[in-house]
Amino acid sequence: PDTAKGWPDVPNFIMTDNQRMMRWIVDGWVTKMPTFMGKAGLGTMRWMDCSSVSKRPGDLKSRYSETLRGSGVTLEMVWRNMGPPLPVEVTKDNSATKEHEMYSVFLEAASAEVIINGTPLSGAVAERQFFGRTMSTAFLAFSETWVTPQEDI
């Protein structure tokens, strides 16, 4: 997201079957998250239509993958070696947007990769502080729900 270019020059794209909803998510959440705030690539990413999604959950301990296809691109995301389920409740003050509360169940992955048209992207899973503990930056979030606190409505 640091480069002001989009696909196919750099692997900077978003693939969705609901562009209107995804633009709402990007504008209302993603642009407010510290990881993406002010990043040159956020405004230049290419928006592509997704025509199919396949999921391979395996046993959810050793491997999980999702493959998206559309606009001439095949995107595969793979997570491996998951830890135990971790229920998460994040208050507005501790959330990435500082505007919403978030509830989810996370499965932390020890390793992960992103593959575009058969070519793995460079990079590695890192560790950082989440919820008072050191966690991998690669995890699955099941039933992730973002809400606006009642006092803000």
Kindly label every feature range from the protein language model.
Residues 1-153:
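Targeting-peptide/extracellular-domain and disordered-appendage signature
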